[in-house]
Amino acid sequence: QERIGRFGRPFNIYKFRSMKLDAEKHGPALYAGEGDSRMTKVGRFLRDHHLDELPQLWNVFCGDMAFIGPRPERQFFIDQIMKEDPRYRYLFQIRPGVTSYATLYNGYTDTLEKMLRRLRYDLFYLEHRSWGFDIKILFMTFMNIAFGKKF
């Protein structure tokens, strides 16, 4: 999938396929919730354990992403968010991340309201980012994946 990264540049994000091939034939869709018929059984497992994100380590290696930073979004959704809150443009200052402060506290987003809440977490991260904050996010991400701890 194409996502928008640092400086507003598009890049291809790598993920394991978790949805059926024609899942977005009617246009881009938000996160698939419980019982979404577009999700495969293997895909549900991958998403529940955040394993669908592993291929993004290649994006980190290529320099498109960082380990920690705001999650990259598709242009379609960025346009919707920017209509409500133009501060989204500040996120283009840094590389998007495989994990983020917003994902830990806001989870997956399936509504515009949740996307705007995620933006507030991302802006908080942008203002307060430091090595210590990044280490805390890495630790919390590990706890979330290994033990299912929610924050």
Predicted segments, located by residue:
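Conserved small/aromatic sequence motifs within transmembrane helices
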Residues: 1-151
